Amino acid sequence: CPLHWSSYNGYCYRVFSELKTWEDAESFCYAQHKGSRLASIHSREEEAFVGKLASQTLKYTSMWLGLNNPWKECKWEWSDDAKLDYKVWLRRPYCAVMVVKTDRIFWFNRGCEKTVSFVCKFYS
């Protein structure tokens, strides 16, 4: 992996402390290295590795992952089977943030327009 990037299972990772929106962070990752994107996480071990990197780099360990709009395929239905013909959703897309605490790691959704740190990943 290049200087300042860390290797894990054939991929290179780097946590950035700059605060960016999800879209700006994704663009920033893309510009860093060929194939680089916001990180996807595929196992508890990979999550722990990224969490350790974040703990070493960030004061507040909250960062964008590559997951966005996780519910866009969701089909909403009324419990009484009535037709969904009226909606007043707040039309804000959501993206995934990973938070690292001393005793656990968790993900939550956050408005993509918010600014947080982020982690990039590419296949080496």
From Swiss-Prot:
Expressed by the venom gland. It comes from the Eukaryota. Keywords: Disulfide bond, Hemostasis impairing toxin, Platelet aggregation inhibiting toxin, Secreted, Toxin. One of its GO terms (cellular component) is extracellular region. InterPro entries: C-type_lectin-like (IPR001304), C-type_lectin-like/link_sf (IPR016186), C-type_lectin/snaclec_domain (IPR050111), C-type_lectin_CS (IPR018378), CTDL_fold (IPR016187). Residues 8-121 form the C-type lectin domain. Signal peptide: none annotated. It is found in: Secreted. Disulfide bonds join 1-12, 29-120, 95-112. Transmembrane segments: none annotated. One of its GO terms (molecular function) is toxin activity. Pfam families: Lectin_C. Potent inhibitor of collagen-induced platelet aggregation. It acts by binding to the integrin alpha2A domain and blocks collagen binding to integrin alpha-2/beta-1 (ITGA2/ITGB1). The gamma/delta subunits mainly contribute to this activity. Heterotetramer of subunit alpha, beta, gamma and delta; only the gamma and the delta subunits are disulfide-linked. Alpha-beta heterodimer and gamma-delta heterodimer associate orthogonally, giving a cruciform conformation. This heterotetramer may covalently dimerizes thanks to the gamma subunit. Belongs to the snaclec family. This is Snaclec rhodocetin subunit delta. The lineage of its organism: Eukaryota, Metazoa, Chordata, Craniata, Vertebrata.
